[in-house]
Amino acid sequence: MSRVANFTSSSIHKLMSKGRGNWSLENVGAPFKSYVQEKIYEARTGVPMNKDISARPAIWGWFMEQWVFENKMGLDYSLVSKKRYKHPDLAWSGMPDTLLEDSVGDIKNPYTLLSFCKKVDSLESLESFKSLTPEYYWQLVSNAILAEKEYAEIFIHVPYEDELADIREFTELYDGDQNKVAWINWATDDELPHILKDHYYKDLNHIRFKVPEEDKELLTERVKMATELLNKAI
C-alpha cells in the first residue's frame, strides 16, 4: 500500500493548523493548504513529492527504532513499523511503530541533543505534549484512529555513551539497507547522539494517554475536508 496521494500520520499535524484568529474547522492554516496541494500533485503524477530521506538524522531514526525495540522494549510489544494502516473511506494512512492490544506507539530518536531535550521536556503533561510537540501528538492520534486503538504512547530515546559500541555492532544485524547505516559503524562517539548516565535526562522517556474522542473527531473532520479538496482536483 502506497503513501502516494494519501494524507499520512507523520505529516497529519499540518491538517490541524489554523489561520488567523481562533481555531475552527473552517479556519485552516497555510500548512493545511500546502499539504493538500502536495497530495494533489502526487495524485496527478503518481509519484511522491518527498521521497525517502537519505540524510543521517532520518537514517539514525529508522535504525535506532529497531535497536530500541530489541534492546529496551518489553516483550508485550509488537514492532509493526512496516505495516501501513489505511482508512476505509478517506485518503488517509499511517504506520505506527508499536502495537499493544489497546494502544499504538511511536519510537522517536532525535539526532540532536537539543531536539531530544526539548521533546522530553514536552512530556511533562499531556497538555504540554500536545502544544509543544504537535507533530508527535497528532501522529499518535491519527495512528490510534487508523488502528482502532483507545490509547497511544510515545518513546523518546537517546543512547547512553557506553551503549555506542553495541549500537555500532548492531549495524551488521540491521534489517534494512546496510549501505545506509555503514557510517554509524565508523562514526566517533562525538559524532553520534548520546548522553551520560547519572545526569538529569534518562535514555528512554515515555508517555501513555487515552486519546481524547474530541481530538479524534476533529482530526477526522479535517481529513474529510482535505480528501474532498483532493478528490475535486483530480
Where do the language-model regions lie?
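Short N-terminal secondary-structure initiator segments
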Residues: 51-64, 106, 196-203
